[in-house]
């Protein structure tokens, strides 16, 4: 379970940061891995409205923090938290730049017809504070957040907002903040109790990525689908991405990782190996299954499709048996 917090306030340790820390802390106490991103520290080129992402599926900017990191984190996340103070009834510039650049993800879904496998289950929360008490104080932010979450492939699950909060440290004196956080997070509670299945192959570039993608798309509400490799490649296999795109599944912005890193972050209930069983660590209480599947890397596109289809069938049966 991975929760991504986006801290949109220019203040490093203000009320927004306190509220986000409370939310992330509650997620961590329930077993999630958490990460907080300070938007003010990111280098994000502003969207120019060029339309390239609508034609090609990728932004023209390839060397800033959105391209190198943020797209990957957004699609890795099970829960995305968008936290920010109100600036002129909307978001401050640093986090607004991140929101605007999510248009590239929107384009992949609504222009190219590809769906990130986490989209059906990913949850989004907005956290905000404002200095005034106007009835419509958060309306602009709420609408922006709703469309940002849709672009990033998340449902707009809930919002936690506070009026008449301005001075640093003021929210800490507000009664009931931690109760409000817990109440909101209950709407995502089923995600914290899913069974964890780790799919592992040698390079974490083809087979394990496809298996995790199919499992997440099919049963992400019941299964936390993890993936890793014994000797991970530097990046996922582009031919695998093309084969999955033929099924309408978007495998862009995927990273590889070691088996050791995966199990250190979250102990799986089941490990499914595909050619790397001898290198998987023994973990007491964890079940193991080995799928004898050939490595399609370096083979023909048709062979990649055959392995993809076999993995899809096995995942379908695994979900039926296990979840």
Language model region names:
Residues 192-261:
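Conserved active-site segments centered on acidic
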Residues 94-108, 146, 262-264, 270, ...:
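A short, gly/pro- and small-residue-rich
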């Amino acid at each position: 379970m991975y929760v991504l917090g986006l801290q949109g306030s220019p203040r490093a340790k203000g009320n927004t940061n306190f509220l986000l820390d409370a939310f992330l802390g509650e997620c961590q106490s329930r077993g999630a891995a958490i990460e907080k991103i300070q938007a003010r520290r990111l280098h994000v080129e502003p969207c120019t409205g060029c339309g390239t992402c609508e034609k090609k599926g990728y932004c023209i900017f390839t060397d800033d923090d959105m391209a190198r990191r943020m797209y990957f984190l957004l699609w890795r996340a099970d829960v995305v938290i968008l936290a920010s103070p109100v600036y002129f009834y909307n978001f401050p510039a640093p986090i607004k730049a991140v929101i605007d650049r999510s248009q590239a993800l929107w384009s992949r879904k609504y222009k190219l017809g590809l769906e990130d496998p986490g989209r059906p289950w990913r949850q989004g929360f907005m956290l905000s504070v404002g200095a005034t008490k106007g009835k419509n104080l958060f309306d602009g932010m709420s609408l922006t957040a709703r469309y940002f979450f849709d672009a990033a492939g998340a449902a707009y699950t809930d919002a936690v907002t506070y009026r008449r909060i301005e001075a640093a440290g003021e929210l800490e004196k507000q009664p009931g903040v931690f109760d409000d956080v817990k109440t909101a997070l209950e709407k995502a509670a089923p995600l914290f109790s899913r069974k964890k299945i780790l799919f592992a192959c040698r390079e974490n570039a083809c087979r394990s990525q496809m298996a995790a993608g199919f499992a997440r798309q099919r049963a992400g509400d019941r299964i936390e689908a993890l993936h890793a490799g014994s000797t991970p490649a530097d990046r996922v296999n582009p031919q695998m991405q093309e084969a999955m795109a033929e099924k309408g599944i978007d495998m862009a912005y995927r990273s590889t990782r070691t088996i050791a890193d995966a199990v250190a972050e979250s102990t799986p209930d089941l490990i499914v190996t595909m050619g790397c069983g001898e290198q998987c660590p023994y973990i007491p209480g964890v079940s193991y299954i080995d799928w004898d599947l050939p490595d399609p890397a370096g083979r023909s596109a048709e062979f990649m499709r055959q392995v993809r289809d076999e993995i899809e069938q096995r995942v379908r049966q695994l979900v039926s048996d296990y979840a």
